[in-house]
């Protein structure tokens, strides 16, 4: 017999929906927005590394990094 906990009772409805697909777009727009924001983040990091994005008072001298 499985132990019944308060947390298990709270999470039970989420497990009951397992395998069901919501018709329509669902959370696709949120996922797309998250991917775009992550891409922008990566581009900013790349530009800082490549020194094509200059930030005041931030010295990017990799020779003296250690």
Curated annotation (Swiss-Prot):
GO terms for molecular function: phosphate ion binding. Keywords: Chloroplast, Membrane, Photosynthesis, Photosystem II, Plastid, Thylakoid, Transmembrane, Transmembrane helix. It comes from the Eukaryota. Its main location: plastid. One of the components of the core complex of photosystem II (PSII), required for its stability and/or assembly. PSII is a light-driven water:plastoquinone oxidoreductase that uses light energy to abstract electrons from H(2)O, generating O(2) and a proton gradient subsequently used for ATP formation. It consists of a core antenna complex that captures photons, and an electron transfer chain that converts photonic excitation into a charge separation. NCBIfam families: PRK02624.1. This is Photosystem II reaction center protein H.
